[in-house]
A protein has these predicted regions:
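N-terminal accessory targeting/assembly segments
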Residues: 1-73
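P-loop NTPase catalytic core of nucleic-acid-dependent motor ATPases
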Residues: 37-46, 121-161
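Long, basic/Gly/Ser/Thr-rich N-terminal segments
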Residues: 42-130
Length: 161
């Protein structure tokens, strides 16, 4: 007797699709995130319980399967991926504009290139993010500091202090 081959469910297809296009982890407060991959560049970071993540799920599902994912499918996929994120053991510090410790301060510039100013006891430099930053809708781009034109009040002007 032949075994019946199970056809993948829409949930299974959406979860597989999401895994191919994002990395999943949780922050130190156990909130699950997706880091959307865009080529070699670190892409946007979405909390799984956000409308941004839900919209992203809709977009990738429509792009690949040419159909709209209903609300229940997106909710089920999100819950599935949240559990996977928590069980994966991947935990990272996620900052909103600033992350720091005893050795450095990193300030997200909020630009499209995902650059930040990294400040250490040895100085500062602009480079790709070293850490994870979440950007809500109120985060706007900061001016990129330039060594040649940097005035002494750059930090004060950025933070309005």
């Amino acid at each position: 007797m032949q075994e019946k081959i199970k056809k993948p469910t829409n949930l299974h297809k959406l979860v597989i699709l999401a895994r191919k296009n994002a990395d999943f982890f949780q922050d130190l407060d156990r909130r699950a995130y997706a880091r959307i991959t865009k080529g070699d560049q670190r892409g946007e970071l979405y909390p799984l319980d956000s409308s941004c993540f839900e919209n992203w799920l809709s977009a990738i599902n429509f792009k690949v399967h040419d159909e709209v994912a209903n609300s229940k499918l997106k909710l089920d996929a999100r819950e599935h991926l949240e559990v996977e994120s928590r069980l994966s053991g991947k935990n990272y510090n996620v900052g909103l504009r600033v992350i720091s410790n005893e050795e450095f301060i990193e300030i997200d510039l909020g630009d499209q290139d995902w650059k930040s100013v990294q400040i250490t006891k040895d100085g500062w430099r602009v480079r790709a993010h070293k850490n994870f930053f979440y950007r809500n809708n109120s985060i706007k781009a900061l001016p990129v500091p330039c060594r040649d034109k940097l005035d002494d009040d750059w930090v004060e002007s950025i933070f309005n202090i």
